[in-house]
Amino acid sequence: NGCGAGRTMFAVDIDGTLYPCHRFVGERKFALGNIWTGSDNSKFLKMINVRNRDKCSKCWAQNLCLGCCPHENYTNTNNINLASERSCRMAKTIYEKLISVYIKMSDEDKKMMWPED
């Protein structure tokens, strides 16, 4: 499922402000609401959906990297939906290597790594 920011993971600031994850604490424009008054994460989730990103929507690795970490994207490109070229290259290289290793694994090794029960 990739990053759980705003979906399965949240962070709460000392004043009750709710953020998608600990890395966004203090970045008020990414606040999802407040634990005392309510919150809405739907806008954030729509924003980080990899299928809504021009750069990622046609990428072969989109379902593996899911557009990289939203906070790292924001730090590197000032846009949570835009991964840096370096991040994309690194993710693709890692997944290419992992796929290559998986293809070379025997069925027995695959069963040992991912048991069915």
Model-derived features with residue positions:
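Short Fe-S-cluster ligation motifs
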Residues: 44, 82-117
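Short capping/connector residues at structural and topological boundaries
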Residues: 8, 37-40, 93
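Cysteine-cluster motifs in flexible loop/terminal segments that predominantly coordinate metals
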Residues: 50-97
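A C-terminal junction/extension of Radical SAM enzymes
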Residues: 1-26, 115-117
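A broad, low-specificity signal marking well-ordered, structured residues that form hydrophobic/aromatic
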Residues: 10, 30, 86
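C-terminal accessory region of radical SAM enzymes
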Residues: 22-66
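Short clusters of hydrophobic/aromatic residues that line enzyme substrate/ligand-binding pockets
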Residues: 3, 32-35, 88
